[in-house]
UniProtKB/Swiss-Prot annotation:
Protein family: Belongs to the primate lentivirus group gag polyprotein family.
Post-translational modification: Gag-Pol polyprotein: Specific enzymatic cleavages by the viral protease yield mature proteins.
Region of interest called Interaction with membrane phosphatidylinositol 4,5-bisphosphate, as start-end residue ranges on this chain: 73-77
Motif Nuclear localization signal in this chain: 26-32
Organism: Human immunodeficiency virus type 1 group M subtype B (isolate NY5) (HIV-1)
Region (Interaction with Gp41): 7-31
Keyword field: AIDS, Capsid protein, Host cell membrane, Host cytoplasm, Host endosome, Host membrane, Host nucleus, Host-virus interaction, Lipoprotein, Membrane, Metal-binding, Methylation, Myristate, Phosphoprotein, Repeat, RNA-binding, Viral budding, Viral budding via the host ESCRT complexes, Viral nucleoprotein, Viral release from host cell, Virion, Zinc, Zinc-finger
Region of interest called Disordered, as start-end residue ranges on this chain: 106-128, 438-482
Pfam families per record: Gag_p17, Gag_p24, Gag_p24_C, Gag_p6, zf-CCHC
Sequence positions bearing Asymmetric dimethylarginine: 387, 409
UniProt name for this protein: Gag polyprotein
Additional note from the record: The infectious clone pNL4-3 is a chimeric provirus that consists of DNA from HIV isolates NY5 (5' half) and BRU (3' half).
Length: 500
């Protein structure tokens, strides 16, 4: 960061930090904006050291300005940052970004007027293209500088890392600024993989070339001396034209920008490829119940860039779908902001929604609205703290106990109604589930059989002689008594009917 921070000196840095991002806004430029700009320039294969001088900033602005119409918001922010930095280097007093852009536009208009005046003075009315990579040498001839390996490497790396995501299109537009059809074909030929996408791109180029030939038929008759032939669709695509012919068309008066035309065809094909590689529709982008609003906005705008629609339609999608497809928590907040809220206000308002702090606040608000204590106890599901309603044993009414009863004292036991004892000494027992008093002290309880079943077989003594009939019956009693001891039966049921 030290190297990037050395772009401005002490006094220049103070001026930098006083310039506002927006007219009338509170936010001002910081050192982090310079660090971000230098990193973005490295992504675009541009030397960040150019930021240290005003001339370097002017060169960068000249490269970025043609791409502002088709570039992304990041590219526009980079252009604005470098424009303000240029004004600081030039010691031009500006208060905000808009004022810096106006100063640069005014300076560019002055330089154009000077160039036109100089051309009029020298009698040269032809306007010659000075776009890189076609430059004018010392002899005044227009020569072509081949595209650098560094630019090709940056393009290949973008395709390998991003595949064909929406940000590939502005990157291609920036790297191919002012390129000839031969340079554009070199960039396309360096793409090793994604041959299916390359085949789709070739088909789109062939369709556009055929449309060009249909709209621009060849004029009959010979070509006048000193005149160039009109380019066909295949000439624009660089397949049937030489580099010298391409330079001639681009520098002719009036010029035929074959490079820009071919570049427009390629971008049209890239848009189709991006749509194929991004099959998700903007209508399917919805915020998850626990997804941060910032991540949802990132997914939304990434998918929106792949949509093939006009800017008016995209603005309508942003205003409508961004709020409509948010989760219920964020949707409530966004609707409260109103339709005129900016994206910055939305992200600030929805920051932290879905986290533990937000859930705690929602729960606290819900609990504060509940004022009935009985409702709180029902929500907790805990009934142990609820008091049972008391009932007086003397008068039978609820709300007080017998000790505090004002009615005449009832005589006798409060349980059975008999006199001679109190309720604590009452011997009456409650009825069991069969409706009978238990234990009854009258034999077995009610859920036992009250009589034994009689055997259906004939008695044993009918099969024996007279002298042996009395012996088994005498021995049967002690056996029964040993099997069912009276002590254990009394402990369970009170008394045994066999002992009675």
């Amino acid at each position: 960061m030290g190297a990037r921070a050395s772009v401005l000196s002490g006094g220049e840095l103070d001026k930098w930090e006083k310039i506002r991002l927006r007219p009338g806004g509170k936010k001002q430029y910081k050192l982090k904006h310079i660090v971000w700009a230098s990193r973005e320039l490295e992504r675009f294969a541009v030397n960040p050291g150019l930021l240290e001088t005003s001339e370097g900033c002017r060169q960068i602005l000249g490269q970025l300005q043609p791409s502002l119409q088709t570039g992304s918001e990041e590219l526009r922010s980079l252009y604005n940052t470098i424009a303000v930095l240029y004004c600081v280097h030039q010691r031009i007093d500006v208060k905000d970004t808009k004022e810096a852009l106006d100063k640069i536009e005014e300076e560019q208009n002055k330089s154009k007027k000077k160039a036109q005046q100089a051309a009029a003075d020298t009698g040269n009315n032809s306007q010659v293209s000075q776009n890189y990579p076609i430059v004018q040498n010392l002899q005044g001839q227009m020569v072509h500088q081949a595209i650098s390996p560094r630019t090709l490497n940056a393009w290949v790396k973008v395709v390998e890392e991003k595949a064909f995501s929406p940000e590939v299109i502005p990157m291609f537009s920036a790297l191919s600024e002012g390129a000839t059809p031969q340079d554009l074909n070199t960039m396309l030929n360096t793409v090793g993989g994604h041959q299916a996408a390359m085949q789709m791109l070739k088909e789109t180029i062939n369709e556009e070339a055929a449309e060009w030939d249909r709209l621009h038929p060849v004029h009959a008759g010979p070509i006048a001396p000193g005149q160039m032939r009109e380019p066909r669709g295949s000439d624009i695509a660089g397949t049937t034209s030489t580099l010298q012919e391409q330079i001639g068309w681009m520098t002719h008066n009036p010029p035929i920008p074959v490079g820009e035309i071919y570049k427009r065809w390629i971008i049209l094909g890239l848009n189709k490829i991006v749509r194929m590689y991004s099959p998700t529709s903007i209508l399917d982008i919805r915020q998850g119940p626990k997804e941060p609003f910032r991540d949802y906005v990132d997914r939304f705008y990434k998918t929106l860039r792949a949509e093939q629609a006009s800017q008016e339609v995209k603005n309508w999608m942003t205003e409508t779908l961004l709020v409509q497809n948010a989760n219920p928590d964020c949707k409530t907040i966004l609707k409260a902001l109103g339709p005129g809220a900016t994206l910055e206000e939305m992200m600030t308002a929805c920051q932290g929604v879905g986290g533990p702090g937000h859930k705690a606040r929602v729960l606290a608000e819900a609990m504060s609205q509940v004022t009935n204590p009985a409702t709180i106890m029902i929500q907790k599901g805990n009934f142990r703290n609820q008091r049972k309603t008391v009932k007086c044993f003397n008068c039978g009414k609820e709300g007080h106990i017998a000790k505090n009863c004002r009615a005449p004292r009832k005589k006798g036991c409060w349980k059975c109604g008999k006199e001679g004892h109190q309720m604590k000494d009452c011997t009456e027992r409650q009825a069991n589930f069969l409706g009978k008093i238990w234990p009854s002290h009258k034999g077995r309880p009610g859920n036992f059989l009250q009589s034994r079943p009689e055997p259906t077989a004939p008695p044993e003594e009918s099969f024996r002689f007279g002298e042996e009939t009395t012996t088994p019956s005498q021995k049967q009693e002690p056996i029964d008594k040993e099997l069912y001891p009276l002590a254990s039966l009394r402990s369970l049921f009170g008394s045994d009917p066999s002992s009675q």
